[in-house]
């Protein structure tokens, strides 16, 4: 009798989880489902409470329907304290066209126009409309992962919005193309600007439709490595039309928790913490307000940036050979973020693979299976298992 009851309970649990997952969207057709929610109160930095552990990403959330508001609150906090405002754009401000295989998007704000261009490389297999993987400045993932799959690829050229790069010439803060459109947001960090630019490309794809672009806008992924891995994560977190985010070796300011990196710095490690990151990417006030032990006053941490991707799919790729990348801080952040997906019965939509013994941004073949599984399931809709992708080696 006991065995029968246990079997029935197990079946009921599995059925409930399956039903819950089937009702949870894989992607949305709007950039921000939380646009109707007002921003929460934003205290001055020195009035924020000290939070030693990673903040609770699910604070106040009991069911999935409550996640939209919590996700919106997290997004507002990240913009206010971390990267600056990502401004909304009305459909009539965007005009898109195809020039051969190049998507061209003109965005008008006031009297200013910013033009984005992205060449689309169509696959040699399959039929349109195709899934699309967009690389933030480039796709660092090996080409063979896409060559035999019906997935188009494109590049978001970040310099068209903000041309900052760590090496070489670039404009100063307040002098970028984005700043022509939004002079009041000249203090923004690059990641808010780049996320804005990615969203405008997706606006263009939606506006033209699959008949013109040959792209299935329900199956768009973004990926990048290093600084561009952070970029991919911010783009995916702040645009719910992106079905899959693959953040490759994103380092500090990406998936690695600021709090954990601060503690590792105190322990003698040399990594990208909130004091040593590149402040062209973030609000300069973030360093002023949250340097050193003040990081514990930050009302969020990077696990919540990751969690903003939920209920969509996220794969984090690490490389512990490079201490600077702070994978020891990314792992607890990833574990904390995954609890959000798990709460809603969709834990198999988020995973990580942290493996060393290879160059920076050079994914080894040993990590191909994890990437292939996420691409196949979330871009191509194939029946592939992605549960329990929590691989950690050499850390």
Q: At which residue positions do the language-model features occur?
A:
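Sec-dependent signal peptide recognition
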Residues: 2-7
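Hydrophobic h-region of N-terminal signal peptides that target proteins for export
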Residues: 10-18
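Cap/lid segment of the alpha/beta-hydrolase catalytic domain
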Residues: 135-218, 251-260
